[in-house]
From Swiss-Prot:
<dbReference type="Pfam" id="PF01138">
    <property type="entry name" value="RNase_PH"/>
</dbReference>
<feature type="domain" description="S1 motif">
    <location>
        <begin position="762"/>
        <end position="831"/>
    </location>
</feature>
<keyword id="KW-0808">Transferase</keyword>
<dbReference type="InterPro" id="IPR036612">
    <property type="entry name" value="KH_dom_type_1_sf"/>
</dbReference>
<dbReference type="GO" id="GO:0003729">
    <property type="term" value="F:mRNA binding"/>
</dbReference>
<keyword id="KW-0507">mRNA processing</keyword>
<dbReference type="GO" id="GO:0010323">
    <property type="term" value="P:negative regulation of isopentenyl diphosphate biosynthetic process, methylerythritol 4-phosphate pathway"/>
</dbReference>
<dbReference type="GO" id="GO:0004654">
    <property type="term" value="F:polyribonucleotide nucleotidyltransferase activity"/>
</dbReference>
<dbReference type="InterPro" id="IPR027408">
    <property type="entry name" value="PNPase/RNase_PH_dom_sf"/>
</dbReference>
<comment type="function">
    <text>Involved in the metabolism of all major classes of plastid RNAs. Required for efficient 3'-end processing of mRNAs and 3'-end maturation of rRNA transcripts, but is not sufficient to mediate their degradation. Mediates tRNA degradation. May function as a poly(A) mRNA 3'-5' degrading phosphorylase. May be required for plastid ribosome assembly and non-coding RNA biogenesis and accumulation. Seems not required for efficient translation.</text>
</comment>
<keyword id="KW-0540">Nuclease</keyword>
<dbReference type="GO" id="GO:0008033">
    <property type="term" value="P:tRNA processing"/>
</dbReference>
<keyword id="KW-0819">tRNA processing</keyword>
<protein>
    <recommendedName>
        <fullName>Polyribonucleotide nucleotidyltransferase 1, chloroplastic</fullName>
        <ecNumber>2.7.7.8</ecNumber>
    </recommendedName>
</protein>
<dbReference type="InterPro" id="IPR012162">
    <property type="entry name" value="PNPase"/>
</dbReference>
<dbReference type="GO" id="GO:0006364">
    <property type="term" value="P:rRNA processing"/>
</dbReference>
<keyword id="KW-0698">rRNA processing</keyword>
Length: 922
């Protein structure tokens, strides 16, 4: 099966390290530098740059590889100071305006560093590379960190340490926006760790820094030594008043119906992410076209800047596996690998492919093609592979040795096998597997699980799995399964967002996506959410946000928790489908149902006998995502799109390809929505009995503070007394009460009604409790927290020496409001509710003789008839009887000392508190 090992020392293309970088050879296959000429004796003459340390068997060689023009320090000048690049400042187009790009002023020791200014928003970006390449893998060692400094807006962090903490979610999302368009432009085989740091140094609140940060990173990479293929740039497109605006301001985006971010090169689109209000596919393509034109203009300017001021690229650092290794792997595993890729079950297929990979590695190792132990990145001791040399020995070709020259020993040439590292074998095996998978799709029109290109996996969904959850759904599509759970709460459950503006922002709806390692049958880390989890959760959240009711129609904070139980591709879109059904199961009145689908693409290249046309795949699996050329997620209903995200793994795509993918995705969404309608058991469409109850009341805005109290004492006492969960009060007078049962909700309502009502003369209050006594009368609670004075003369129709002669604390009586003074103090009367006959009879009684003082005093304790009539005249009669209708009249707040028991009126009228002028206090 295997051909004989080659006599060649190495098979890879000779590699040269870049300017001003000294490297050490660490691989047996790494070539020596040979001079262009050979000695007359036919031996290879070593270049003077190849330094041999030690000789003979068991010795090892260390070769310092430096460019010939690096013998003199290029970074030094005559005075010993470092020679840094000159300060460069240019303007380049950025949508409908220009941005200022500066380099050479800051971060001069980095591979490249730029500051990009838009208005008064400034983003600084630096690029640095490791001197030593990391171990080869199928993942580019690119690390992006984006941070918004509080000092950019003249603020300081509110934390104890007064410095920026861990990366916030929206910063993670911008990190992903920077990372995703850069990766496709990086060449395979480049393993030097690359770090991109991007900081917002100044923010004017008008020009958003996200698209600016992506463009800044594209400029920095173009100027650096990173061997990227093309420069990239990013823009944001909004739809305002029916017109597409490139890079709109923050205020303009508040009115936009579209939030589209696009990044690419001067010829192709690399990344798209956006959210809209059921935007038709045709308008979405128009927006992409507008954004692509803006990106193209920016990228052309960046390319010109890079050619003039950029550093030489590290093309010589690219290390690819030897071409012969592909041939060996195909010979050993081609047929078996093709059969393994046709296994429908993901786990069974993965185990079969893994077993075959180990088999190939074992065979190559036994044949002597694989190095047993490779410590990539360390200096390796190795015998000289060409020959053993001593200082007193001269090596001459065999047949030219004189018998008398005993000190000269001919050394025959031995064939040296071609050696591969274990990492190279695994990389090549994976690439061969990917090509075979793509070949099956292109040539046979069938995918690994037997589906056609536009076929969607079987779908099953169930609602109401979790009895105590407010809403739950298990959504299954093929081997991808998501458990979506909805929790309802009040504003205190809202997610607080810390931003540069410093304004308190709360998210009423948020989706949290979790991808545990068990979902793919692996053992892994469990901890804080990864960048991938944050990104996928945000995409699903924005897809569902459009269908939610307004806060006025549904005053709940909504949390959706999507846990991926099983994954084989498109788990974020499964979260959209499961989340939509879970919202309906929780009783959230959504506007419509939405679904999500992930689209893929495989090029029908000449390698497979094709013409280079794209093949669009619907509902891709994990293997198709990893081996394909595109991952395009689209969510929406039958008519429009709510969220979309596209990542390209090749040089980019055109608008025609995107249009084809959108049309196919629309058909797929309709099919998924039809399957979701078959959910069994279906969503309940009503609130769970375990969901909290929320009552909304309106009070006068001026009375909100009195309900809250000093330091929140009053509202806390209301919560404690009534037993509700929470009370939220807004500046406009809206009061939201949340409770788990109706009884506590009614108690809180009664308390707030009492505190917020405005009493009017003539109002009658039944069953009121006497709270305390004084020599001059009794204090009666007419509503929770509201008391009035019933003077001793108004407690009874008969004369009383003291209030205790008629009542005691705790007794309940009916009273009538007869006066409200200028301080808001209430004067009540029991006597005013007594029948007229008792009052008249009592007024005709004679006073005791000889007690003139008592007579005068008692006269003062009676209500003056004319005064009572004037009070009664202020009230309007109801047509059906003699009860008075409540007047909506504000009373200003009054305070008094504890000695005279002054009452306070701290709130406004509650229209539901009184009926026909009466309020029953239970």
């Amino acid at each position: 099966m295997l051909t004989s090992p080659s006599n060649a020392l190495h098979s890879s293309t000779p590699q040269f390290w870049p300017l001003r970088r000294s490297k050490l050879c660490r691989s047996r296959n790494f070539p020596r530098f040979h001079s262009g000429e050979r000695s007359s004796g036919g031996g290879g003459k070593l270049c003077s740059l190849s330094l041999l340390s030690g000789s003979g068997a068991g010795k090892f060689s260390v070769r310092a590889l430096v460019r010939p023009d690096d013998t003199d320090d290029a970074d030094s000048v005559g005075d010993g100071s470092l020679a840094f690049p000159n300060h460069v400042s240019v303007k380049i187009p950025f949508g409908n305006r220009e941005i200022l790009v500066e380099t050479g002023l800051m971060g001069r020791q980095a591979s490249s560093a730029v500051t990009v200014t838009d208005g008064e928003t400034i983003v600084y970006t630096s690029v640095c590379l490791a001197d030593v390449p990391s171990e080869p893998s199928d993942f580019l060692p690119l690390y992006v960190h984006y941070q918004e400094r509080f000092s950019a807006v003249g603020r300081t962090s509110g934390g104890f340490f007064k410095r920026e903490g861990r990366t916030k979610d929206h910063e993670v999302l911008i990190c992903r926006l920077i990372d995703r368009p850069l990766r496709p432009t990086m060449p395979k085989g480049f393993y030097n760790e690359t770090q991109i740091l991007s900081w917002v140094l100044s923010y004017d609140g008008l020009h958003a820094p996200d698209a600016l940060a992506v463009t800044s990173a594209g400029i920095a990479v173009a100027l650096s030594e990173v061997p990227n293929a093309k420069a990239i740039a990013g823009v944001r497109v909004g739809l305002i008043g029916g017109e597409f605006i490139v890079n709109p301001t923050v205020k303009e985006m508040e009115e936009s119906q579209l939030d589209l971010f696009l990044a690419g090169t001067d010829t192709a689109i690399l990344t798209i992410e956006g959210y809209s209000n059921f935007l038709p596919e045709e308008m979405l393509l128009q927006a992409v076209k507008v954004g692509q034109d803006a990106v193209q203009a920016t990228c052309i300017a960046i390319e010109v800047l890079a050619k003039k001021y950029g550093k030489p690229k590290m093309l010589d650092a690219i290390r690819l596996p030897p071409p012969e290794l592909y041939k060996h792997v195909k010979e050993l595993a081609g047929e078996e690998l093709t059969k393994a890729l046709q296994i429908k079950s993901k786990i069974s297929r993965r185990k079969a492919i893994s077993s075959l990979e180990e088999k190939v590695l074992t065979i190559l190792t036994e044949k002597g093609y694989v190095i047993d132990e490779v410590a990539f990145g360390t200096i390796e001791a190795q015998p000289d592979l060409l020959e053993d040399e001593d200082e007193d020995e001269e090596v001459v070709p065999e047949g030219e040795v004189d018998q008398g020259d005993v000190h000269i020993r001919p050394i025959p040439r031995k064939p040296i096998p071609l050696l591969f590292s274990e990492v190279d074998v695994k990389l090549v095996f994976k690439e061969v597997s990917s090509k075979l998978l793509r070949r099956r799709i292109v040539e046979g029109g069938k995918r690994s699980d037997g589906r056609t290109l536009d076929e969607i996996r079987p779908i099953n969904s169930r609602c109401g799995l979790l009895p105590r959850a407010h809403g739950s759904t298990l959504f299954t599509r093929g081997e991808t399964q998501a458990l979506a759970v909805v929790t309802l709460g009040d504003k205190q459950m809202a997610q607080r967002i810390d931003n540069l503006e410093g304004s308190d922002e709360y998210k009423r709806f948020y989706l949290q996506y979790t991808f545990p390692p068990s979902s793919v049958g692996e053992v892994g880390r469990i901890g804080a959410p990864s960048r991938r989890e944050i990104g996928h959760g945000t995409l699903a959240e924005r897809a569902l946000e459009t269908i939610l009711p307004s806060d006025d129609d549904f005053p709940y904070t909504i949390r959706v928790e999507s846990t991926v139980i099983e994954s084989n591709g498109s788990s974020s879109m499964a979260s959209v489908c499961g989340g939509c059904l879970a919202l309906q199961d929780a009783g959230v009145p959504v506007k419509c149902s939405v679904a999500g689908i992930a689209m893929g693409m495989v090029w029908d290249t000449e390698e497979f006998g094709g013409d280079g046309s794209p093949l669009i795949l619907s509902d891709i699996t994990g293997a198709e995502d990893a081996s394909g050329d595109m991952d395009f997620k689209v969510a929406g209903n039958e008519d429009g799109v709510t969220a979309f995200q596209m990542d390209i793994k090749v040089g980019g795509i055109t608008l025609e390809i995107m249009e084809k993918a959108l049309i196919q995705a629309k058909a797929g969404r309709r099919h998924i929505l039809a399957e979701m309608a078959k959910c069994s058991p279906p969503p309940t469409l009503s609130l769970s009995k375990y969901a909290p109850l929320i009552l909304i009341m309106k009070v006068h805005p001026s009375k909100v503070y009195s309900l809250i109290g000093s330091g929140g004492k009053k509202v806390k006492s209301i919560i404690e007394e009534s037993g509700v969960e929470a009370i939220d009060m807004q500046d406009d007078g809206t009061v939201k009460i949340m409770a788990i049962d109706v009884a506590s909700l009614e108690r809180a309502k009664a308390i707030i009604s009492g505190l917020t009502m405005v009493p009017s003369v003539g109002d009658i209050y039944r069953n009121c409790e006497i709270k305390s006594m004084a020599p001059y009368g009794a204090f009666v609670e007419i509503a929770p927290g509201r008391e009035g004075l019933c003077h001793i003369s108004e407690l009874s129709a008969e004369w009383l020496a003291k209030p205790e002669d008629a009542y005691k604390v705790g007794d309940r009586i009916d009273v009538k409001l007869i006066e409200v003074n200028e301080k808001g103090q209430l004067r009540l009367s029991v006597r005013a509710l007594l029948p007229e006959s008792e009052t008249d009879k009592d007024s005709q009684k004679q006073q005791p003789a000889g007690d003139s003082t008592k007579d005068k005093s008692s006269q003062r304790k009676y209500v003056n008839t004319s005064s009572k009539d004037r009070a009664a005249a202020g009230a309007s009669k109801v047509s059906s009887g003699d009860e008075l209708v409540l007047k909506k009249k504000d009373v200003r707040r009054a305070t008094g000392g504890s000695s005279d028991k002054t009452m306070n009126s701290n709130s406004s009228t509650n229209e539901e508190s009184l009926v026909n002028g009466e309020a029953t206090i239970s």
